[in-house]
Amino acid sequence: IYPRDAEQPMKEEVLLTSPLEYTNEPYAIAKIAGLKMCESFNLQYGTNYIAVMPTNLYGPNDNFDLERSHVLPAMIRKIHLAHCLKEGDWEAVRKDMNQRPVEGINGDSPKADILNILRKYGISETEVTLWGTGTPLREFLWSEEMADASVFVMEHVNFKDTYKEGDKDIRNCHINIGTGKEITIRQLAERIVETVGYQGKLTFDSSKPDGTMRKLTDPSKLHSLGWHHKIEIEEGVRR
């Protein structure tokens, strides 16, 4: 929801200060409309809606679908499958493919078909290929901590706590929920490789797009209200 060229880390007050990322504009506008609706209801009718803006989430029951998943669960699954291939553990490969078929190929498909579809997604016994240079920075929050932060906000925060008393214009009263810490995609992939125990090669295909180079929220407002995250990315990946 924040502007394409917003200063990093992104504070709540940078909302609507410059153009949005063009490819993400409709999605961002829909979210911003929800934030503004809550804010306006509070100001006009005295309601007590609190809007929050989470960073990238990961955790239990994540989406590991190679065709549609986000970066972290996609990397975990790719490296896990490559490790299984490297170890010759076809029982684990077939179990994984039965749980989450890829383009119609499942664990009951012929071995050659499974290997071919995995290669299409950069997965082989000797190598895992990921898109981009690996240099973009991203922030990740354990999903259960998002739930914890949301409950904390509902129980301990009121609308009047989200802006400075005496402000002429009351706006951007939402609260960022994040860690305020970032990691490169390469570092993240290397952590996953280490955790899984994969002994193959990790390759980045720089002919593919990197996406936005940096996305980091500033959670200082939430910190001032009394909530801090506890689970770091290393522990989250192990879980």
Regions from the PLM with identified roles:
Residues 31-34, 68-72, 181, 185-186, ...:
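A structural signal for well-ordered alpha-helical scaffolds and beta->alpha junctions
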Residues 25, 66, 70, 74, ...:
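Amphipathic alpha-helical recognition patches that constitute DNA-binding helices
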Residues 81-239:
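C-terminal substrate-binding subdomain of Rossmann-fold SDR/epimerase-dehydratase oxidoreductases
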Residues 45-59, 67-84, 128-131, 145-155:
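Hydrophobic, aliphatic-enriched repeat segments that assemble into extended interaction scaffolds
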Residues 14-17, 71-74, 223-225:
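Short, structured secondary-structure boundary patches
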Residues 33, 37, 41, 71-75, ...:
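Hydrophobic alpha-helix immediately C-terminal to the catalytic Tyr-X-X-X-Lys motif of short-chain
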Residues 1-58, 62-68, 81:
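Catalytic helix-loop patch of NAD(P)-dependent Rossmann-fold dehydrogenases
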